[in-house]
């Protein structure tokens, strides 16, 4: 079996590592660097340049040099994040036939996975040159808060690059593997990962070779590229004030600004002041113009204050989801080049109340972790168990527009959950399964991942057919959903593909709205549940009354009819408590009728009912009623 390589496919830079002699080793590229710029350029002759070669010619070829493509992967063209990128990008971002965001270079369209594949091919070649043999198997990392479509698109990029992607793992988890492999003591750690394009925070428990992720959060549109953009805007604004020329309108000048901004940002991590000198940046009728500015660390921190402030929210949420306070965290591991900024380190210290651990190389640690995971999968690394989580809840839409969750956020993956649903109407021949991802109570407030139908259900009263819906998340975090009619054995399934992913803005919006609308959502849900239960009660009472009404006296029958009328009236309103009260009163009034039904049914059905009850107990099934109203069993 050939070697398994670990690849950190980064927004700004990528890195590749392997396990050799039981130790992870980062491999230097042909240019002698241990990291490779995630850049691709197409020259006049159609030649593809990747990495440092692409970066070197970016100033003279800005429209055909692609960078930060990871921010487009698995995203729709119409998303706010993509619109923001279009406004500042020197290259052309276009709408694909499937509504995804693609790029156009020299008249040809490329999908983000295609461009990412070019970077992956460079990493593959780097490993092959070092090993002297062909490499096919790889573990590739993604931000922990990447959604289903982004993970799928990353896997597709690996396939395009000729790699057999054994596993997609989360970047903070990979970093934790690299940090904790030789640690013997049990500890709780926070991995703070601020890279070129994304921000992740993961809380893990380490002990006895087990790496268990307790929670994860983040922002897939916050990273070094955004810090660079703030600096670019400041430089351009200063120059415009001085010369009256907006350099953002000149793509070649803009590319020079980008390089200068990145260089200044890096220099200010170790010095208090830097000069930005760009001679012959542009020209007008009066002659050439030169740019010369001083930028201090304090000014840089002020320019980027709005981005620094965005780091705290996800950290607090991750701690809350893990059920921990900052004082419970033993170590905070810094990952990603942006964590070299002193202001970022200070903010991390303020959030967690302790000095962060800088014992790992923030640029290489993720690739090292990916290589370790490759070693685990190949069997070279023993006694290591990695337990990762899914970042968002998954479920389906049920009667009344409610989202019924099958898998909660921060559930350990891989995982599989099933629940039994039924039909909402008599003789219903098909059910539509609406697959959702998000944290809101109502289906319409969450993100649709897909829709499919289970047809050919035999005619039967509502509530009788049993439809088992199963959610399956694999170790890569990719979702599969199936629905099966337990009566006929007929099954239909859907694999959520890259075209139906979820953007980061939508995730953030969902979480924020979920918090602000929590009580409102709860009331809506309670009202719908009360209505659903009342509807079932009305249906069953009317059915029993028509069949067994002659077995009870007229006064009892009148009480039931009055109770039915009162409940129907209550159901027209929006008061859940009133509906529950009317339901209870109808149930009280129906006691005599229930006795008549029971007396009639017992002799004929006692044996059968007993058997069915035992079978249900054995399976421990949780049945949800036809109209997708949950019928809760007592907890066992």
UniProtKB/Swiss-Prot annotation:
Residues 626-636 have a biased composition (Acidic residues). It comes from Geotalea daltonii (strain DSM 22248 / JCM 15807 / FRC-32). PROSITE patterns: HSP70_1, HSP70_2, HSP70_3. Induction: By stress conditions e.g. heat shock. Keywords: ATP-binding, Chaperone, Nucleotide-binding, Phosphoprotein, Stress response. This is Chaperone protein DnaK. Acts as a chaperone. Residues 614-625 have a biased composition (Basic and acidic residues). InterPro entries: ATPase_NBD (IPR043129), Chaperone_DnaK (IPR012725), Heat_shock_70_CS (IPR018181), HSP70_C_sf (IPR029048), HSP70_peptide-bd_sf (IPR029047), Hsp_70_fam (IPR013126). The gene is dnaK. PANTHER family: HEAT SHOCK PROTEIN 70KDA. Residues 602-613 have a biased composition (Low complexity). HAMAP family: DnaK (MF_00332). Disulfide bonds: none annotated. The modification Phosphothreonine is found at residue 198. The lineage of its organism: Bacteria, Pseudomonadati, Thermodesulfobacteriota, Desulfuromonadia, Geobacterales. The keyword Metal-binding does not apply. Residues 602-636 are annotated as: Disordered. It holds the Pfam family HSP70. It comes from the Bacteria. Gene3D superfamilies: 1.20.1270.10, 3.30.420.40, Actin, Chain A, domain 4 (3.90.640.10), Substrate Binding Domain Of DNAk, Chain A, domain 1 (2.60.34.10). Belongs to the heat shock protein 70 family.
